[in-house]
């Protein structure tokens, strides 16, 4: 499949993408990063509907859409009829009736998108910008692009995902596709936050058991909005037991990379001074987020033709 020939009706989960489609999106993102341009003769209207706070995902989608020449339809949850009790379904039904081509949605409800993509009335394409603790496909794709740019492969790579596993949509999206692409996965973090579903994809370890051998060390944000972690750990204890300290950073392979979906709780998951350290690719992940989201929007618009 050519990287610019992929066409998707919606993009709501990594599970709905074939390996071939995943690689096409990654390679198209790299092409955009290297300067590829696209021009649309017809108008394309995109609306970003974020029902949870977001900086990187929301703004990266906006930049991606602007770079593609799309027209952005503003949506502010605070001033919308959501505050009158309007359901998500009726909000998107309205967008569809208005002729919006693509809705990028972040919502706290897991699997919110199912009734939208199954509706015979809603014709707007849906891109999932994150559903509660469920899936985060665009973050997963930018992570994959970052890893692929670094190593040129996934097969045989050792990847450790560490932190607040149970509450992380990033962990769930990444574990599924990385295993499918041939990576060897390890999961680290507090036992209280790691359910058995992760055991189907990799091995439970401590950070110290694998820090010297992994190619990718991916830390996850402690999601304090979804639970009260300080009732279990102080910030200092969490960092000492489960975070990236200078001592652990020094033990990483010279060729290994450090990743985090951000925002980073500095001195909790990662020591403050290591966020931009030489092995860190956290800023690169943000940059890649624009280009892989250009590939996503392009593919979804192509799927509407």
Swiss-Prot record:
PROSITE patterns: CARBAMOYLTRANSFERASE (PS00097)
GO CC annotation terms, alphabetical: cytosol
Its EC number(s): 2.1.3.2
Lineage of the species this protein comes from: Bacteria, Bacillati, Bacillota, Bacilli, Lactobacillales
Function: Catalyzes the condensation of carbamoyl phosphate and aspartate to form carbamoyl aspartate and inorganic phosphate, the committed step in the de novo pyrimidine nucleotide biosynthesis pathway.
Species assigned in the record: Streptococcus sanguinis (strain SK36)
GO molecular function: amino acid binding; aspartate carbamoyltransferase activity
Annotated positions binding carbamoyl phosphate: 56-57, 106, 136, 139, 262-263
Keyword list, A-Z: Pyrimidine biosynthesis, Transferase
Annotated protein name in UniProt: Aspartate carbamoyltransferase catalytic subunit
Top-rank taxon: Bacteria
Subunit structure: Heterododecamer (2C3:3R2) of six catalytic PyrB chains organized as two trimers (C3), and six regulatory PyrI chains organized as three dimers (R2).
Family label: Belongs to the aspartate/ornithine carbamoyltransferase superfamily. ATCase family.
Pfam families from the UniProt entry: OTCace, OTCace_N
InterPro entries: Asp/Orn_carbamoyltranf_P-bd, Asp/Orn_carbamoylTrfase, Asp/Orn_carbamoylTrfase_sf, Asp_carbamoyltransf, Asp_carbamoyltransf_Asp/Orn-bd
Record-listed L-aspartate binding positions: 84, 169, 221
Pathway in which this enzyme or protein is active: Pyrimidine metabolism; UMP biosynthesis via de novo pathway; (S)-dihydroorotate from bicarbonate: step 2/3
